[in-house]
Structures are given as structure tokens and as C-alpha cells.
């Protein structure tokens, strides 16, 4: 491309230095403001495209719920556009359906899809079985409760703690950046009316009639309104129950007499029995207070404001009540940003030192002044685009740091060379721009395009890392702009002509390199063969690189999940969870532990998926004093659980750095027949157990729970004046209690529950003796029903409307879940080839997500390749040159694979991003070399000499650019999140640069038949 002097930016900038300085200072000031204003968080936000639809059908078995409730809802839900998958589980009396949208659905349309789903499901409410409550919807899964506090107090009841927690909740709402405040582990109070069946029978009452009397006395109903000439007067009835005494005073008409309810029944107040989900802090009962932050808020500022408020609250709490911090996201964010800031500072120092030593003092000063301007300009761009400071955006700045000086180095070095040859300063600056500016811009855009697939991929992992592309693009384009304007100005001001050097490339080093090039050009076939062999060998070695979607984080938390057999009561789970807590409470590495029974902890970090409530499930969030302590504790907890809780499956895991998977190894078995699915799931589990790298296998649906079927004799019911409802209510009252009404007390809606005296509540072995009250007296259940003892499924899982069992497994130390999953799946080859029609065995978990993400990441690659080729063609204007450059791009894989093996880094999502980004950088370097060959040819040099001398002339700037990029990446080698990408880019660029300087000249000579 030819350059008109009128559009020579460097010359214009030097002539208008005051304007350049003004805008440079303006960018510096705006950049500092932007940096201080940017939101701060640990992870970038991304849209969780899932929704939970739940419904209750009291009294129905899991199979009935699946067939008549879950199935009906799922069939309607699948008609919603852009549904990716539907998973569900059905339990006795409950179904929970999780709906996932396709990754391609834009975040802006997610709420609209959920509204459509609500409307479509509401349309079929009338078709649901009688007695169904709901459906209920939850689509707010992206709220992160990063600050959790536990209120504990010896001698304080749950209700006492709840009241204080409610007051604290109101205080928190007044703090800037607070979005939501939720209470965790609250135990609702209930009023229990207890009496025996004989008393009911004597009074001629049944539970249904008693319930109607109590409900009529506690209901709030309109009493009318008197319309006057100028105002309306509302009539209010007083005396509705608002205390135990008022409930005891409710009149009961029975056998022609009026009794006080308190005279014929015992009235007590207590907590829900069985209890609701519970929370403990360091083994003490607790009420949790969880806060989420406003979108775009500043976590560090929120942390400071919370610290002030907590100090005030603690000073006002009564003696014995303690407010403890369970999760402290602001502190995590502060440490995370501090870590990446240190990496950024280290990278800046490294690049500055390299620039000073390689370019000399004055040229180094020019580069040193460009770096802060580019970085602060990047902060301005981030502020304009609404990109917060977090691990991805800060990491992107570190990655770009080594590249952002490349353009300035080329311009400044060329100015220095021309000035050393006696050129006048303005002419040298003008020549540097005219010669390098547009090829460098083309190369910069190509480098940016290498990151494009991250931004335009439709996977959740890509959305997680999507800020990488805009931050890199802003930074690198700014670096080109600065190299075209400020760098020439500063070079004009500071660089002084040096002694003219004759034959500056006639040194021992360059002579040896020239000899290597000449030998390579004389043995072209051998060089190409060696290169192809190295590439093929590296691809073979790829089999030995470990695969991991996202590594574990460096957070101190350890998530310990406890699963008891299906059908276990929440009380049993509570006992097991407390036992496990006691086993670890004195561990030397433990800082604190919070225990959640019946459900998981709130989502206190974005990359954590909360578990839906289950009676047989508990979660311990163990916070260690250090990362090393966390690793030690994980091993000890596994052994303690195996030795002391053999009835439970206890699995511990650290929090991942990206989208999570519940277990490292996950395989799904789906089919049309429940029995077949169970049979083949058991076979899959056997194969999984046979793998020495897999431990603690479990299936999410297998065990059955006890059940008793009551065959009612309708004729006897008729003779005794009973109904099925009367029998059901009598059974419920005697087994678990029957809610007959509720009343308002303060801000609470308290249920009134009727149940029989404790000594009359039946156990499973005495069901036949349960008394059923009739008008003639109580009769045993055996007189009206035949009992059949058996078992039934307590949980039925489905995926896309088909019965599905997921077989899960943990892994031993030193292997990755993706590698082990693939091995187990390969071991199932024979079983998979002989499956009955309709049966499927599929990969799940992290490996499935990884494959899906890679597929999504590759979708935009054709567009990226086309854009890169268009730019190359416009710049080079020769198809053979374009082909040569494109061929060199894969050479980076040689260094990538050997680098991953050398540093024991996994091939995962971040490494895949590094490979794509690396291609753009390699193409950029190759283009610069090809452009130099053309310049020498245009100057009249012989083709062979042009090829050789171009590689020599460009050796220093290309190596220097690669060297600064690689050294700038070194701080990220120590980052858990960025390690794989840093290793990929550093090792790939090192290998590709060395090969490019030798192989590209050979390919050029072959393509153009240079002799």
C-alpha cells in the first residue's frame, strides 16, 4: 500500500506536538478516573440461562408425580422456542423441572423466553391433577450472595435469632450496592393442636369438621363498608386469634354442647417438625443473612461499607448473640485484583527493562512513556463499554502488555536506524510511519481477530471470558495509534543520531544465522520434512497432554457434599451432618465451617451451582486457613467420612475457576424403560468401579424407599359413614400432622397444625392399629383397609422427557476428570455397541461442557479466517504470499504441545483460547517478514539475497517483539486461571518465531521458485 505524505500521521503529530501532548494528558487523567470508577468483582458476570419450575402434589407417589404432573408440564415446556434441554426429578408430592436455554440465545432475550414459558405453563394449569399447588418459577439464578453472615447465640431460640436477623436485614438494605438480602436456615413456628382419637370419637367430631371450625374462626373476611355522604367507613371484626390463648378460646360445638378448644385439646407452640432446611456455623444453630450486590457494583466499596455497618450492629447486639462472617466476597475480590495487579506491575517492569536494555536508554524511555498511556486509555475504553475489573479483564491487560509495545518498538527502532545512517529526524519518523504503519495496523487487527471467537462464540464459558476480546482489541489498537503519533513525537524529541555503522549486520551472530539460512535454502526438502515431522510428532504427543475444562480455584473454601440413601429423613441427615462437623471442628487447618442441611449454601460465588432442596442432602462449606491447608483437609475429610459415616457418600471438591460440574466423572444412561435404565446404569457403574482412577461412584437415582399401599374397602367406608378424605386426614394427623388453618402474628403467618398425641402417633409397624374416628367411635385402620408393605422409587430423574440416571464418580489425585471420563467411556465401547433400541450412554459433566464449548468456540473461526485472509490479501496482494503465511500459523502447535507437557499444564478452555490468539500473532510476524522481502525486492535486491537479508534485518525486531510478549506472560504462569493460556502463548510463540525465521524463507523460495 502506498502512503501519501499528506496522511503521514507521524509527520503531522510532530508538527502538532502540542495537540498530541494535550490529548495524551487528557487520556491519562480520564484513565485514572476510569480506573477508580470501574466496578470490581472476582469473576465477570454471565447470564445463567436456566429456570426452575416446581409444583407440589401432596399425597402422590413419585411415579404418580412423574406420570401425571411432571410429564404434563414438560410436554408443554418443550414447546418454548430455543430450549436446549429439560431435566427434572419427581419425588413423593413434588416435582422440580430445570429448563436450560440454548447458548445461542442472547442475554437480552432470556427474560422474554422465561415470560413465554410462564404464560405457556399457566395455560395448562387447568389440566393438572386436582390438589396440585403451583407451578412456581425461579429464574433468578445469576444472583451471587457473596456476603453471608451467621447469627448465633447460646440460649437464644430460632425465633429470637430470626427477629434480630430481620432487623439486620433492614439495616443492610440501606447500604449502597446492596441488591438483595435473604435469610437462610429460618425455622418457621407452628401452633400444634394435639388430642387423641378417643376424644374426637366421643365428641362426634372428625378432623375435617374440626378443621372447618378452626378455619372459620381464624379467617379474615370482609365485613362490609358503610357509605356516608362524604366518606366511607369500613367495618372490622376483632377477636380473631393472635395468640395461643385466643386459639384455646375458640368455641367448638359438639354433641349439642359448646366446648373451648383448649378444654378438649392440648395447644402448643413450636417449630416445624420435621424441620425446614437448617444452617449451622461451627456446629452452632444459626440464621444466615445473605447479601447480593447490584450489577456493576464495587465489591471493595461494598465491603468497606459492610464492615462499618457490622461494627455498629455488633455493638448493639445483646450479650450472647454473635454475628459471624461466613462468606466475604469483597476480601476475595480485593485479593484477586491485588494478585492480578501485581502480575500487571511485574509485566510492566519486565517489558520496561527489556525495552531499555534492548533499545538503549533514550529509545527505552520512549517505550516506557507509551505503556502507561496505552493502559490508562484501555481503562477509558473499559469504562465506556461497562467492563469491570475482574480476573478476565485484568488478565487480558497482562496478556496484551507484551504485545502493546511491539508496534512502538518497530517504529522507534527504525527511526533510530535511519538516524544512525544520517537521516534527519523528521524524515526518519516520516519514513518509519510510511514503511511500517499500515503493515503494523494490518498485523494488529489480525492479532485482535485471533481473539474474536471468544467474543462471538455462544457458549457460557465463552461468555464468561468474553471481555478478553474487547480489552485486547482496545489495548492493541491504542498501541498502534500511540506508535503512529506519540512514539514518533517522543522519538523526535529524545532520540539522538549515533555514529553511522557500516555493515551493522556483519557480526559473528548474524553471520552464523546467515549461514543457517543459506544452508536451509539449499536443503529445502529436508527443512520442510523436518518441520512436518516435528508437527506430526507434536500432534501425537497431544495424547499425553492432560485435559481439564477449568482448573480448581485458589479460594480456601472446600465444598463437602453429604448424600444419604434415598428416603432418609432430614433429621437423619441433620445428625450425620453434625457428626461430620464435629469430626473436623478441631482440625488445625480449619478456619470455620458452615453447614447446610436439606439444601446447599446460597450461591456465594458465580461459578457455583446451588443444589435443589432434598431431605437426604447436606453441604458443608469448609474454609481452610490456606490453600495448602485446604488440600490437606480434603484428604482428611474423605478418610474421616469413610471411617465414621459408611452409610453416606461424602464427596469434597474445591470451587472451580469456570462453569462447574458436580462431579469430575459423569456418564448418563437414558432410555424409555425405567427397569432397563437401572440395569444399564448399574453396568456402567461396574465399569466405572473397575477403573483404578475412579472412587466413590454413585447414581443419582437407584435406591428405593419404604412405602405402604392401603387398599380401601369402599363398602365398609360407606357403612361407617367415612370417606377416603376422612381416612387420609386421620392418617396424616397421626403420622405427620395436618395443617387446618393459619393466623397472623406481627409479620408472621403461623400455621395451625392438628395432630394426635405423641403416644398415639403411629410408627410403621403399627399402622394397622391407627384409630379412625367415626360417629360411632374410633375404629382401627385395619377394619377399613388392607395394608401392603413394599418399596417404591423415591426419586425419578428425567432428561428431555426420558428416564435418565447419571452415574457419578470422584477421581484419585494426579489425574483430571476429563481424561478419566474419556477412558471410562472408551471402556464402555462394547456395552454401547449392544444397547437395546432407545437406550443411550452419553458423556456428561465437565467433558461434555468442554466438548460443547470447543464446538461453540470453533463456530466463528471460519469468519475469523476469512477476515484474516482478506486483510492479508489487501496488504500483500499476492495469493502465494498469503498461502505461505497461512501455512506458518500451525507451527505454533509444536511449541504449544511441548510447553503444556513441560509445565504439566492442562489443555482446556483457556489453552484453546491461547491457541486461537497465537495464530493471529504468528501470522502478524510472518506478514512483517514477507513485507520486508518485498521491500528488498522493490529496492532492486536479488531474490535470494532479499530472502536472506530480510530474515536477518527482521530478526531483531521480530525476536524482540516475541521476547517482550513471552516475558510479559511470565507473571501469568503463576496464576491458576491463566496458566494454561500463558504457557500456550509463550511456548507456542517461542517455537513458532524460531521456526518462522527459518521455515518461512524456505517456503517463500519454494513458492516463488527462487534459485
Question: What does each model-found stretch correspond to?
Answer:
Residues 2-40, 434-436, 502-550, 591:
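Signature of alpha-helical transmembrane segments and their immediate interfacial
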Residues 401-415, 436-456, 463-503, 620, ...:
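Transmembrane alpha-helices and their membrane-interface boundaries in multi-pass membrane transporters
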Residues 7-8, 65-139, 198-219, 240, ...:
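Solvent-exposed, membrane-proximal periplasmic/extracellular interface segments of envelope transport
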Residues 18-19, 25-60, 122-131, 383, ...:
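Transmembrane helices with small-residue packing motifs
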Residues 22, 61-68, 105-115, 145-150, ...:
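Solvent-exposed, non-transmembrane alpha-helical starts
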Residues 9, 326, 337, 412, ...:
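Helix-loop junctions and hydrophobic alpha-helical segments within the transmembrane domains
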Residues 30-37, 349-416, 474, 867-954, ...:
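Hydrophobic transmembrane alpha-helices and their membrane-interface caps
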Residues 2-5, 12, 54, 125, ...:
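Extracytoplasmic/periplasmic membrane-proximal domains and adjacent transmembrane bundles
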Amino acid at each position: 500500500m502506498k502512503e501519501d505524505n499528506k496522511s503521514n500521521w507521524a509527520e503531522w503529530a510532530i508538527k502538532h506536538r502540542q495537540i498530541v501532548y494535550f490529548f495524551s494528558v487528557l487520556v491519562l487523567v480520564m484513565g485514572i478516573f476510569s480506573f477508580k470508577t470501574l466496578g470490581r468483582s472476582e469473576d465477570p458476570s454471565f447470564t445463567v440461562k436456566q429456570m426452575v419450575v416446581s409444583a407440589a402434589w401432596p399425597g402422590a407417589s413419585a411415579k404418580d408425580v412423574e406420570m401425571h404432573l411432571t410429564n404434563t408440564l414438560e410436554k408443554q415446556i418443550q414447546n418454548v422456542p430455543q430450549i436446549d434441554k429439560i431435566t427434572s426429578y419427581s419425588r413423593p408430592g413434588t416435582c422440580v423441572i430445570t429448563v436450560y436455554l440454548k447458548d445461542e440465545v442472547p442475554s437480552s432475550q432470556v427474560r422474554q423466553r422465561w415470560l413465554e414459558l410462564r404464560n405457556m405453563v399457566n395455560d395448562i394449569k387447568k389440566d393438572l391433577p386436582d390438589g396440585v399447588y403451583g407451578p412456581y418459577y425461579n429464574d433468578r439464578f445469576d444472583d451471587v450472595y457473596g456476603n453471608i453472615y451467621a447469627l448465633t447465640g447460646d440460649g437464644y431460640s430460632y425465633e429470637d435469632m430470626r427477629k434480630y436477623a430481620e432487623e439486620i436485614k433492614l439495616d443492610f438494605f440501606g447500604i449502597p450496592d446492596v441488591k438483595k438480602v435473604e435469610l437462610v436456615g429460618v425455622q418457621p413456628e407452628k401452633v400444634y393442636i394435639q388430642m387423641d382419637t378417643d376424644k374426637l370419637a366421643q365428641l362426634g367430631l372428625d378432623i375435617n369438621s374440626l378443621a372447618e371450625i378452626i378455619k372459620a374462626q381464624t379467617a379474615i373476611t370482609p365485613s362490609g363498608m358503610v357509605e356516608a355522604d362524604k366518606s366511607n367507613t369500613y367495618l372490622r371484626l376483632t377477636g380473631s386469634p393472635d395468640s395461643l390463648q385466643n386459639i384455646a378460646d375458640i368455641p367448638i360445638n359438639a354433641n349439642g354442647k359448646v366446648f373451648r378448644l383448649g378444654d378438649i385439646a392440648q395447644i402448643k407452640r413450636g417449630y416445624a417438625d420435621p424441620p425446614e432446611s437448617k444452617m449451622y456455623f461451627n456446629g452452632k444453630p444459626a440464621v444466615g443473612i445473605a447479601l447480593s450486590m447490584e450489577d456493576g457494583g464495587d465489591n471493595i466499596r461494598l465491603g468497606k461499607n459492610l464492615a462499618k455497618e457490622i461494627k455498629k450492629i455488633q455493638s448493639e447486639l445483646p450479650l450472647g448473640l454473635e454475628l459471624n462472617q461466613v462468606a466475604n466476597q469483597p476480601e476475595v475480590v480485593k485479593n484477586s485484583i491485588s494478585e492480578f495487579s501485581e502480575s500487571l506491575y511485574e509485566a510492566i517492569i519486565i517489558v520496561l527493562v527489556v525495552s531499555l536494555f534492548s533499545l538503549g536508554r533514550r529509545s527505552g524511555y520512549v517505550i516506557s512513556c507509551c505503556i502507561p498511556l496505552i493502559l490508562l486509555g484501555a481503562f477509558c475504553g473499559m469504562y465506556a463499554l461497562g467492563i469491570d475489573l475482574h480476573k478476565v479483564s485484568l488478565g487480558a491487560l497482562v496478556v496484551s502488555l507484551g504485545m502493546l509495545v511491539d508496534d512502538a518498538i518497530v517504529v522507534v527502532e527504525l527511526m533510530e536506524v535511519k538516524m544512525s545512517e544520517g537521516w534527519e529526524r523528521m524524515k526518519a519518523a516520516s519514513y518509519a510511519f510510511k514503511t511500517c504503519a499500515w503493515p503494523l495496523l494490518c498485523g494488529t487487527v489480525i492479532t485482535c481477530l485471533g481473539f474474536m471467537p471468544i467474543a462471538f462464540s455462544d457458549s457460557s464459558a465463552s461468555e464468561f471470558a468474553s471481555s478478553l476480546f474487547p480489552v485486547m482489541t482496545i489495548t492493541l489498537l491504542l498501541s498502534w495509534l500511540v506508535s503512529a503519533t506519540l512514539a514518533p513525537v517522543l522519538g523526535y524529541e529524545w532520540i539522538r543520531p549515533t555514529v553511522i555503522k557500516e555493515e551493522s549486520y556483519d557480526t559473528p551472530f548474524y553471520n552464523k544465522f546467515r549461514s543457517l539460512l543459506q544452508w536451509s535454502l539449499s536443503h529445502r526438502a529436508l527443512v520442510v520434512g523436518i518441520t512436518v515431522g516435528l508437527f506430526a510428532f507434536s500432534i501425537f504427543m497431544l495424547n499425553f497432554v492432560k485435559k481439564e475444562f477449568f482448573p480448581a480455584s485458589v479460594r480456601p473454601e472446600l465444598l463437602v457434599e453429604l448424600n444419604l440413601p434415598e428416603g432418609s429423613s432430614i433429621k437423619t441427615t441433620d445428625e450425620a451432618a453434625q457428626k461430620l462437623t464435629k469430626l473436623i471442628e478441631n482440625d488445625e487447618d480449619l478456619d470455620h465451617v458452615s453447614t447446610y442441611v436439606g439444601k446447599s449454601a446460597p450461591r456465594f460465588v458465580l461459578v457455583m451451582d446451588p443444589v435443589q432442596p432434598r431431605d437426604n442432602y447436606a453441604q458443608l462449606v469448609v474454609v481452610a486457613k490456606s490453600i495448602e491447608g485446604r488440600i490437606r483437609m480434603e484428604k482428611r475429610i474423605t478418610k474421616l467420612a469413610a471411617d465414621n459415616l459408611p452409610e453416606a457418600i461424602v464427596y469434597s471438591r474445591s470451587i472451580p475457576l469456570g462453569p462447574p460440574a458436580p462431579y469430575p466423572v459423569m456418564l448418563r444412561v437414558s432410555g424409555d424403560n425405567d427397569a432397563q435404565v437401572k440395569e444399564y446404569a448399574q453396568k456402567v457403574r461396574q465399569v466405572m468401579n473397575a477403573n483404578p482412577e475412579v472412587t466413590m461412584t454413585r447414581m443419582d437415582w437407584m435406591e428405593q424407599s419404604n412405602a405402604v399401599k392401603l387398599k380401601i374397602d369402599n363398602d365398609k367406608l360407606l357403612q361407617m359413614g367415612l370417606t377416603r378424605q376422612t381416612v387420609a386426614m386421620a392418617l396424616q394427623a397421626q403420622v405427620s400432622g395436618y395443617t387446618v388453618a393459619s393466623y397472623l402474628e406481627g409479620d408472621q403467618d403461623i400455621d395451625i397444625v392438628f395432630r394426635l398425641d405423641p403416644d398415639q402417633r403411629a410408627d410403621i409397624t403399627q399402622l394397622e392399629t391407627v384409630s379412625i374416628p367415626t360417629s360411632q367411635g374410633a375404629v382401627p385402620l385395619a377394619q377399613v383397609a388392607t395394608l401392603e408393605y413394599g418399596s417404591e422409587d423415591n426419586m425419578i430423574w428425567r432428561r428431555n422427557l426420558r428416564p435418565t440416571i447419571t452415574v457419578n464418580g470422584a477421581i484419585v489425585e494426579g489425574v483430571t476428570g476429563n481424561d478419566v471420563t474419556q477412558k471410562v467411556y472408551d471402556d464402555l465401547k462394547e456395552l454401547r455397541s449392544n444397547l437395546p433400541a432407545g437406550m443411550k450412554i452419553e458423556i456428561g459433566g465437565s467433558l461434555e461442557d468442554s466438548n460443547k464449548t470447543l464446538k461453540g468456540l470453533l463456530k466463528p473461526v471460519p469468519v475469523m479466517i476469512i477476515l484474516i485472509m482478506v486483510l492479508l490479501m489487501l496488504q500483500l496482494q499476492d495469493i502465494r504470499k498469503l498461502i505461505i503465511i497461512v501455512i506458518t500459523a500451525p507451527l505454533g502447535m509444536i511449541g504449544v504441545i511441548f510447553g503444556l507437557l513441560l509445565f504439566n499444564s492442562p489443555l482446556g478452555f483457556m489453552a484453546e483460547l491461547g491457541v486461537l490468539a497465537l495464530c493471529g500473532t504468528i501470522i502478524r510476524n510472518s506478514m512483517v517478514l514477507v513485507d520486508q522481502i518485498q521491500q528488498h525486492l522493490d529496492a532492486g535486491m536479488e531474490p535470494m539475497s532479499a530472502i536472506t537479508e530480510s530474515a536477518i534485518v527482521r530478526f531483531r525486531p521480530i525476536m524482540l517483539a516475541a521476547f517482550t510478549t513471552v516475558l510479559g506472560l511470565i507473571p501469568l504462569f503463576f496464576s491458576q486461571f491463566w496458566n494454561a493460556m500463558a504457557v500456550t502463548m509463550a511456548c507456542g510463540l517461542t517455537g513458532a518465531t524460531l521456526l518462522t525465521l527459518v521455515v518461512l524463507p524456505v517456503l517463500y523460495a519454494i513458492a516463488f521458485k527462487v534459485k
